[in-house]
Amino acid sequence: MQSQITLTLNASCLRQPPKRGGAPVALMDIPEFVSQEFGLRGIQLPVDLIRGRTLREMEDLRHNADKAGCPLLVLSQDDPIDLGAVNDGAEGIARIAALGSAARHLGCGHVAIRAAVPPERIDAVIACAKRAIDLLRKNDVGLLMRSGHESMPDPSGLADIIRRIGGFHIGAMPSFADAHAFGDMGSAIRLLAPYSHMVEATVTGFGKSGHDKWDLSEAVEALRGVGYMSLLSIDWRGTKGDWVALVHKAQSELLAAIGREEQVA
């Protein structure tokens, strides 16, 4: 049976010009660029790319994405949100609600956040997350919790938080980088993949023997080993070289690991 893992792109790489000395891709042109350059059919959109944009502009971007056949799938927040604050997490809940409103106008089905989870306030974080999810549901948007924040529990702890929150509107969005930092990449991926709607395939560069920090095929094999059949977002985090060519290289290696030679539309 053919794997159903679908490659998408984290648009954070598009802050950089695709050609040396050129200009970055304009926000409204991102979906068409991703579709035509990489043949991908989905985008993870960092929230800072739309900061200051009007609702009309976000709806226009959604229209362009639909027209290009490259929808905006997840609106992601990099800066941590404090859901365990002593003020009952009201500020964090409001930030998530605002993300949900933006996601609705963009056509994103999920927002992804990094939450600060102090060990002594896990119960408060869970209660606040439930309140935030109630607000997100009004916009038909789900919540994904990202790993990697210094106060976030290990993968097992994050999985436990997601189980305790419960329901169909909560999930995880782990990354290869965070799984590698945990110390046992395969174990971290296997723990969180069953709760994940999207996984970030972090790519930092390539050497003579392949990816420079971890084996992309081993990471994909860990996903396949637990039956993961959802989104895998190519997340370029390198600082050297032709990033477009290197994203193409990552795409080829990931497709080979998934078991396909080309992206399925």
Question: Model segments located where?
Answer:
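Histidine-acidic metal/acid-base catalytic patches
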Residues: 1-39, 66, 152-170, 174-265
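Active-site acidic/histidine proton-transfer and metal-coordination neighborhood
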Residues: 2-3, 32, 64-77, 81-174, ...
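Short, conserved active-site loops that position catalytic residues or coordinate cofactors/metal ions
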Residues: 11, 38-47, 74-79
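Residue-level marker of alpha-helix boundaries and capping positions
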Residues: 21, 51-52, 90, 123, ...
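Catalytic domains of carbohydrate-active enzymes, especially glycoside hydrolases
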Residues: 26-48, 102-109
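Glycine-rich, proline-tolerant flexible connector loops at the mouths of alpha/beta enzymes
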Residues: 41-63, 115-120
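Positions that flank functional sites
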Residues: 49-50, 80, 118, 151, ...
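Catalytic-core regions built around general acid/base machinery
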Residues: 57-67, 127-138, 188-191, 218-223
